[in-house]
Amino acid sequence: MNEEIQTLLIYQICDSLRFQANMEDISVDDVMDVMQENIMVECLLDGVIMDKADVQKIVIQYVTDGELGEEAIGDKMESMYSNSRKKLLKEIDDLDNTISTNRKKDKLLNLYRDTVLNRLQNKKTVLDKLYHGMKEDSSVIRNRIYLERIKNETPNSIAELQLMLQRSIADCIMSEPIGSEKYNIAKEIQINLEDTIRFMKRALE
């Protein structure tokens, strides 16, 4: 909770004590008692603990030369409320813009992912079939990459997607004997991936 809202809250408590409880002299202890006993105030504070010194500073602001300036206090409270409202609305707008930007970014990343995978799948050598055919206990694969996850999850970046696909192809190449049919297929897929990445870079420029 920011200082303006804390100040507003204590001003409201002071007003309540003064006009509803008919208390001419308001002490810091009176304000502290309300803060500790009032469920609404407790919810507004939301776990924020204000010590006596903090409350005293705000109560002193409320009191002008030992007397309560009713009109001035009302104007100050209205000004603080207006400023807090503007700040809150700006925070909401900023959050909406961030969410909108993130959604657009996710859509672009998913589009890039789908385009790259579709171009690889449209070739006669299909990466996922080759990868699924590898032995589970292959000693050259430390952390097996599951291509279904690549297809269904939004990558954090284009670079991450390219890295995952590159690792998948490298796993295929490293797990097969040089010159074997699967080795040659994996090498061809490597060329296809490089061509696809170049194609996508040109498309995005």
Curated annotation (Swiss-Prot):
InterPro entries: EAF5. GO terms for cellular component: cytosol; NuA4 histone acetyltransferase complex; nucleosome disassembly/reassembly complex. Keywords: Chromatin regulator, DNA damage, DNA repair, Nucleus, Transcription, Transcription regulation. The keyword Methyltransferase does not apply. It is found in: Nucleus. One of its GO terms (biological process) is DNA replication-dependent chromatin assembly. Belongs to the EAF5 family. Component of the NuA4 histone acetyltransferase complex which is involved in transcriptional activation of selected genes principally by acetylation of nucleosomal histone H4 and H2A. The NuA4 complex is also involved in DNA repair. Component of the NuA4 histone acetyltransferase complex. This is Chromatin modification-related protein EAF5.
